Amino acid sequence: MAAAGLVTAFGHASYREDDAFHITPPKPLGSLQPDETLSRVSLEAEELPAGVPGEAWVHWAIYRNRPDVGGICRAQPQTATALASAGVPILPLHGQGAFLGREVPVFGDARLVRDRKTGERLAESLSDAGALVMRGNGAVAVGADVGLAAARMWVLEHSAGINQKAAAAGSPSPISEEEFAYWDSVSEEILGRIWAYLKS
């Protein structure tokens, strides 16, 4: 995500393992080494262990609320953040936009999510969508694994750019229900290819 410009000094990623998740340390993702030690957080935890990002509550709450999610990415996509601040919805205007949901939800609290209760509210706002924009505070994307979550974050920012241009040019028209269902059915295949591109 760092190479794609989605994270700078801030951002984190995690993957689920049984009744816990492993999360990156609170340091720039682009500085991590392949042998970097990740922290394990139990999904039954009442408090976060030392050395994890304060916003690990975001991951904790989403994993508890979404059994289908195996990976989460937290990043700072600029265009998506700007559209949320301007009240412009991010809609599926192109096929890959369907990977995010029928409209990307926005979490209205711009403060860092550093407590359990706020994390739970964010997870409720995400619902069954593929991504959520945190107004004034970046975004979070989910996937069956962490690679697909990173790919979905890339799609979020790409889709935000398309929405920005479409809104400036006229009245954006989302893809049809039939088209949405088709693209949703091939999401993992296409997201896998995007992840391969991001790793290249």
Where on the chain are the PLM-derived regions?
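Glycine-rich flexible loops
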Residues: M1-S200
